[in-house]
UniProtKB/Swiss-Prot annotation:
It comes from Bacillus subtilis (strain 168). Keywords: Hydrolase, Nuclease, Toxin-antitoxin system. Its EC number is 3.1.-.-. The active site is at 96. Gene3D superfamilies: bsu32300-like. GO terms for molecular function: RNA nuclease activity. Probable toxic component of a putative type VII toxin-antitoxin (TA) system, probably an RNase. Probably neutralized by cognate antitoxin YutD. The gene is yutE. Belongs to the HepT RNase toxin family. Homodimer, probably forms a complex with cognate antitoxin YutD. A motif (RX(4)HXY motif) lies at residues 96-103. It comes from the Bacteria. GO terms for cellular component: toxin-antitoxin complex. Disulfide bonds: none annotated. This is Putative RNase YutE.
């Protein structure tokens, strides 16, 4: 029996999609506020990927991850995301350390290019999660 909190995962995915929409709606990140907003959006996208990955791993009793990269490796191994998507998302996840621990070194231009370069994988991530949930658990029901 799986203990997957679909409601929590769906809230996280909705928040993720909102952050991605905010990224897409902005055309100028050059101001100081713009750069800080971009860094926050990038950080939140990464956290949503990791939180959703951990929720999937815990809920479906997959093997325990040993690192952030390993979360993506497990999602690839379990066929939640494709290998290409996993590799692309890992490139963005690798920037987490800079955003969280080495924030003085954060380069908004580099982060912008990373998000743009892997935007398809980012857009597909919620679809892949939802598809896997429906395949494994069936359609969402109004009853809990």
């Amino acid at each position: 029996m799986y203990f997957v909190d679909r409601s929590k995962i769906e809230k996280t995915l909705g928040f993720f999609e909102h952050q991605l929409a905010l990224f897409d709606s902005q055309t100028d990140w050059q101001s100081e506020i713009g750069e800080l907003a971009l860094q926050r959006i990038g950080h939140l996208l990464i956290e949503c990927i990791l939180d959703t990955g951990n929720d999937m791993i815990d809920g479906f009793i997959m093997r325990d991850p040993g690192s952030y990269d390993d979360i993506m490796d497990i999602l690839v191994d379990e066929k939640v995301v494709t290998e290409k998507e996993g590799d692309e998302l890992k490139k963005l996840i690798a920037y987490r350390k800079t955003l969280v621990q080495q924030y003085l070194l954060a380069d908004s231009g580099e982060l912008y290019r990373l998000i743009k370069a892997h935007q398809t994988a980012l857009q597909d991530f919620p679809k892949r999660i939802r598809s896997y949930l429906e395949t494994e658990l069936g359609p969402v029901s109004a009853f809990k």
